[in-house]
């Protein structure tokens, strides 16, 4: 039961992390040539980042791998133990899927549905900035604090150097061996 709680806290922190970010990763202003600015990368991979979730009662640290295809799809793999993926979050600009591999369950939701339960809201651009180390806080570390219910949750991510334009594995996880649950049961 205690492990369930860790998964929920880490999942909530990861999904809420971009809530306060307002800076865009890519400028929407035309460049000197009059064309919109194009991102400097197509794929991005950050391996073995350290994500730490701190609550009033607990502290949980896990390795996180973030794989992104620009404006298309991203995968966040949470591995508290070396090489064992325990939680996976797959996202597209329209949908989020959280997969709990330990308990054999998953939940799907849209950003609109998720934002009915979260305050402030979360969007694709903010999540993509988190997964590519393009946050206004810099490429080395991100730190956020939230109120979730009556509990304060703090998330600290320490990034390793990112690799761009490398092959990434962002194929959808086959969900037929998992049981679908409502996202509200996790949040």
Language-model regions, residue ranges each:
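N-terminal leader/targeting segments and the immediate start of mature chains
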Residues: 19-65, 179, 184-187
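An acidic-aromatic
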Residues: 73-125
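Charged, gly/pro-rich active-site loop segments
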Residues: 121-140
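Bacterial N-terminal signal peptides that target proteins for export
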Residues: 1-7
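C-terminal motif of bacterial Sec signal peptides marking the signal peptidase cleavage site
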Residues: 14-18
